[in-house]
UniProtKB/Swiss-Prot annotation:
GO biological process: symbiont-mediated activation of host apoptosis; symbiont-mediated perturbation of host exit from mitosis
Induction of expression: VP1 and VP2 are detected 12 hours post infection, while VP3 only after 24 hours.
Family: Belongs to the gyrovirus apoptin family.
Originating species: Chicken anemia virus (isolate Australia/CAU269-7/2000)
One Pfam family hit: CAV_VP3
Name by which UniProt lists this protein: Apoptin
Residue ranges, annotated region (Disordered): 1-28, 57-95
Biased composition (Polar residues): 58-70
Domain of life: Viruses
Keywords, ordered alphabetically: Apoptosis, Early protein, Host nucleus, Host-virus interaction, Inhibition of host mitotic exit by virus, Modulation of host cell cycle by virus
Localisation per UniProt entry: Host nucleus
Role description: May act as transcriptional regulator. Induces apoptosis in infected cells. Element of infectious replication cycle.
Cellular component terms per the entry's GO annotation: host cell nucleus
Length: 121
């Protein structure tokens, strides 16, 4: 924002307070937080509150990590859809079909069958 936009009062739905100084006010009991939203910087002055580190959704560079939270936090906004997982069926009819196919493929006439377990998660 340039100086002309800061001095122009906004619409009637918001409260306009002229800036008191151009330098951020930071004392042990007062912090100023700047939040950037779509090219607009919002400045919040928080006085009489405790310090707390909060992780952000975006990773921050080492210089800005003090202001934006922890550095190298993954960006959670770009979640890729997970590929569909293969679910094994516990249907006895499907097990018999696969067992029959398996017996046709094998050439040994008498092979001992082992029990298979299907575990549902």
């Amino acid at each position: 924002m340039n100086a002309h936009q800061e001095d122009t009062p906004p619409g009637p739905s918001t409260v306009f307070r002229p800036p008191t100084s151009s330098r951020p006010l930071e004392t042990p009991h007062c912090r100023e937080i700047r939040i950037g939203i779509a090219g607009i910087t919002v400045t919040l002055s928080l006085c009489g509150c405790a310090n707390a580190r909060v992780p952000t959704l975006r990773s921050a560079t080492a210089d800005n990590s003090e202001n934006t939270g922890f550095k190298n936090v993954p960006d959670l906004r770009t979640d890729q859809p997970k590929p569909p997982s293969k679910k094994r069926s516990c249907d006895p009819s499907e097990y018999r079909v696969s067992e029959l196919k398996e017996s046709l493929i094998t050439t040994t006439p008498s092979r001992p069958r082992t029990a298979r377990r299907c575990i549902r998660l």
